[in-house]
Design a protein with these regions (language model features):
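Charged (often Lys/Glu-rich) extended helix/loop segments that serve as interaction or gating elements
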Residues: 9-157
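Alpha-helix-loop-beta-strand connector modules within alpha/beta enzyme cores
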Residues: 1-7
Length: 157
């Protein structure tokens, strides 16, 4: 940058974010229920917009794959979370062969996943696991409901 604009007399800092670590994160989510609708089928999963807001906020495309591929007829689904909001979706219009209880990998969920997550609807933020080769380390545990209320106080009676 200095070669192009010269010495500006200041320190230049950059924040590369998603470009470096976006593809390093995967959100795992379980299929809770398959709901057939009129003209549209839904996969209700246990992750929600509070865990990964990018699809709802930016209409970001997230690649979604079953952790264990299954034989059978693939259907077109919208992946939605358990929060009762029209924006609670992780992916739309995906061709997948799945059953209740299957585990899904929502890819490219790194970079800003945790910092953009929230406790909306009293949902604890997801755990974070670092995988290095064949080793896995829990680097942040899932928040409990008790932890969400820990900083609150009752009013005196």
């Amino acid at each position: 940058i200095r070669e192009t604009v010269g010495d500006l007399g200041c320190e230049i800092e950059i924040e590369p974010g998603r470009n470096i670590v976006g593809n390093a994160g995967i959100l795992l989510s379980g299929v809770v229920f398959l709901k057939r609708g009129e003209g549209r089928d839904f996969l209700i999963v246990d992750a929600a917009m509070n865990d990964l807001i990018r699809p709802a906020l930016y209409q970001a495309w997230m690649d979604v794959s079953p952790v264990q591929p299954r034989d059978g007829e693939a259907r077109n689904y919208d992946l939605v979370g358990p929060i009762c909001e029209t924006g609670d979706f992780l992916a739309k219009d995906r061709e997948l062969a799945l059953a209740e209880g299957d585990l899904l990998a929502v890819c490219s969920a790194g970079a800003y996943g945790f910092v953009m997550s929230s406790n909306y609807n009293t949902r604890g933020r997801a755990a974070e696991v670092l995988v290095d080769g064949d080793q896995a380390f829990e680097v942040r545990r899932r928040e409990s409901v008790q932890e969400l209320y820990a900083g609150e106080s009752l009013l005196p009676t």
